[in-house]
Regions:
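Short sequence/structural segments immediately N-terminal
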Residues: 1-213
């Protein structure tokens, strides 16, 4: 249990005690100190508890474990271990180009002012579909919209390997087109092999444990 969860439990306990005290001794609110106590216990602390809970949930929901907790996501998690460099998620995950504990969120958030919250709002929709909707087959799951190069360039822009890659200079203006989002990084016959869960039955897989020996 981390510090945020402990603080949340402490807040809830304090709110409960103060609320019971206010209900048991309503005459306390007749005095100025009692009114302050009631305001803190019934208004300030609940808001702080809600904020702490929301912060804790937001942090947990960015974890790879959370994203893959739905059964329909199992094949997407499996695709991170495909032993093929052309699989973009696998290459990034296996080489620590993205933090493994937050791999899904790192690539699927929007790198804008409120991008994290938009990503979480989409996550709420996923949860609703998981429990109340019709769950699609893994191979039928698609992005809501075309993947924006902004998300790729958040990490790759300015990197020497990106700037000097021969494949990025097949045309003289490729980097400029990618920067302006006119040429998609993950389509246009470039990095177009992403999760490809429909092909996993024919794939070979990398084992971190085997390579650690």
């Amino acid at each position: 249990m981390n510090h945020t969860a402990l603080i949340l439990i402490l807040f809830i306990a304090i709110v409960a005690v103060l609320a019971m005290l206010t209900a048991w001794r309503p005459e306390l609110t007749r005095e100025r100190g009692g009114k302050v106590l009631a305001f803190v216990s019934l208004c300030i602390l609940p808001v702080l508890a809600m904020w702490a809970g929301a912060t804790e949930h937001l942090q947990r929901s960015t974890s790879t474990q959370f994203c893959l907790s739905c059964h329909v996501m199992a094949d997407f998690g499996k695709s991170l271990f495909v032993d093929d460099r052309s699989y973009i998620p696998a290459r990034h995950f296996q080489n620590n180009f993205v933090p493994r504990d937050h791999a899904c969120f790192t690539c699927h958030t929007d790198y804008t002012m409120f991008g994290d919250y938009r990503a979480k709002w989409r996550g709420v929709h996923h949860v609703l579909v998981q429990y109340f909707g019709t769950i699609p087959k893994p191979e039928d799951i698609k992005l809501y919209a075309a993947y924006n190069n902004r998300e790729c360039l958040h990490c790759h822009a300015g990197a020497r390997a990106y700037q000097e890659a021969s494949s990025h200079h097949k045309k003289p203006d490729m980097l400029a087109l990618a920067a302006s989002n006119q040429l998609s990084c993950i389509s246009s016959n470039c990095h177009d092999i992403v999760h490809d869960v429909a092909t996993l039955k024919d794939a070979t897989f990398w084992s971190p444990q085997a390579n650690a020996k």
